[in-house]
Amino acid sequence: MGKRSKILALLLALTLALTPVSTASALTPAEVTIDALSAKSFNGAELTLIKLLAETSKYTKHSVTYRSENLKVSGVLYIPKGKGPFPGVVLGHGYIDTKIYKNGQGMRREQDYLAARGFVVLHTDYRNHSFGDDDPDSQLKFRMDYSTDVINAGLALRNSKIRTLDKKKIAYMGRSMGGGIGFNVAVAKSAKGVFSSFVLFAPTSANYVENFNKWGRGNPERANPIVKFVGLPEENPSFWASVSPENYWSQVSAPIMIHHGDKDESCPIRWARAAAQGLNGAGKELSFHIYRGEGHNLMAGWGKAMARSIDFMGRNWQRSEP
């Protein structure tokens, strides 16, 4: 090999060595189904106080982190003042762009309302939000990753060192996307017993095709990676059925309450009605409340909905381990 050839070979080798290697995700469609969620083991723990954010005569509010899979997930925690024991509730917020999301954002009025009435409240930010860890495959996980974070939030609360918490009384409350996540958790067999009941405000559809049609089609940034991963619903209907909780209502093991405004333009009331029909058809305990003239964010009926929710959670505490 001549001198020039050796130099070219060396330059080529250096170029290859310094060029970042693009690694495709090893994630498979089978890993992001409800069956996969049902088969998981959960490790929610290490609930850690990071910073005192506020203190009132009724509670303290802290930024926190907890363990979910191999990630650190952030959130906010409210601890009522007093001897307790206080019941607990995990809150799951609706969709907010992660680029603008702030710690504890999304259900602040519910946080204050519940904490002021004697609930230990853990509001999860989910992975990829606020100052928690990121999951590069999150966009392809059909909210099963956020569902995992919710389940682990319940377990982290139960495994915490909060002495005033009644660890046998923990419920879930979710709104919009967080409501749809609640459906996932409610049908996940491996999450049985983590939450004593589910309260869902204006949930997204329990048929994932409906969610994709509304927010995915026509939005290449969202749709293209998903379509490349699993295909369109009409191309791969069996997969899309496998991520839709409406096909798993028989697996629900805790009572569900749904609040929905009949003028909701974001999550149409027909989605909630379809879920209610499916749950009733499966013989599950459901309390379904429609608020006339209300949109996606309940206004006039919100106080009544929260009072109903507290009563519902109180009637459905289960004293069983997960």
Where are these regions (language model features)?
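Conserved alpha/beta-hydrolase "acid-adjacent" motif
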Residues: 265-271
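Alpha/beta-hydrolase active-site loop
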Residues: 140-161
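Short glycine-enriched nucleophile-adjacent loop
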Residues: 155, 179-191
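C-terminal catalytic histidine-bearing segment of alpha/beta-hydrolase fold enzymes
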Residues: 273-322
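Mobile cap/lid helix-loop segments that gate and shape the active-site cleft of serine hydrolases
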Residues: 98-101, 208-248, 254
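N-terminal cap/lid segment of alpha/beta-hydrolase-fold proteins
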Residues: 38-83
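Short beta-strand/loop motif that positions the catalytic acidic residue
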Residues: 252, 258-260, 264
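Short substrate-entry loop that stabilizes the transition state in hydrolases
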Residues: 84-86, 91-133, 207-208
